[in-house]
Amino acid sequence: MSAYTVSRLALDAGVSVHIVRDYLLRGLLRPVAYTTGGYGLFDDTALQRLRFVRAAFEAGIGLDALARLCRALDAADGDGASAQLAVLRQLVERRREALASLEMQLAAMPTEPAQHAESLP
C-alpha cells in the first residue's frame, strides 16, 4: 500500500493542497491512517477517488452531489450508493445532451462578420 500525505496526494492528482483540504472538509476524502503527529495518510483508493471527484467536478457535477455519493460509499450503503450513481448518470446524460445541442448551434453559426456590421461606425 502506498501512503500519501495531503501534499503528495495533491501532487499526484494534479490539484492544489487547498483542493484536497476542501474535499476533506466536505467529506469527499478521508484518511485511512494518521501519523503520530496527527497528519492524515491516504492510500491508492483515495488517490483514485480524488481523481474521480476532480474529473466529475470539471465535467460540471456539483460537489454536493459528489459528497452524497462518497458518504454512501464510505458507509458501505450499497442502496444509497446505487441511488447516488443513478443521479450522477442522469446529470451526465443531461450534460451530454446540452453539449450536443451547443455543438449543433456552434456548427450553424456564421463564420463571416454580419453584413450590417459594415454600416456601423
Curated annotation (Swiss-Prot):
DNA-binding residue intervals: 6-25
SUPFAM superfamilies registered for this protein in UniProt: Putative DNA-binding domain
GO biological process, alphabetically ordered: negative regulation of DNA-templated transcription; response to mercury ion
InterPro entries linked to this entry: DNA-bd_dom_put_sf, MerD, MerR-type_HTH_dom, MerR_fam
Domain of life (superkingdom): Bacteria
GO molecular function, one term: DNA binding
Key words, A-Z: DNA-binding, Mercuric resistance, Plasmid, Transcription, Transcription regulation
Residue span, HTH merR-type domain: 3-72
PROSITE patterns linked: HTH_MERR_2 (PS50937)
PANTHER family listed in its UniProt record: HTH MERR-TYPE DOMAIN-CONTAINING PROTEIN (PTHR30204:SF93), REDOX-CYCLING DRUG-SENSING TRANSCRIPTIONAL ACTIVATOR SOXR (PTHR30204)
Official protein name in the record: HTH-type transcriptional regulator MerD
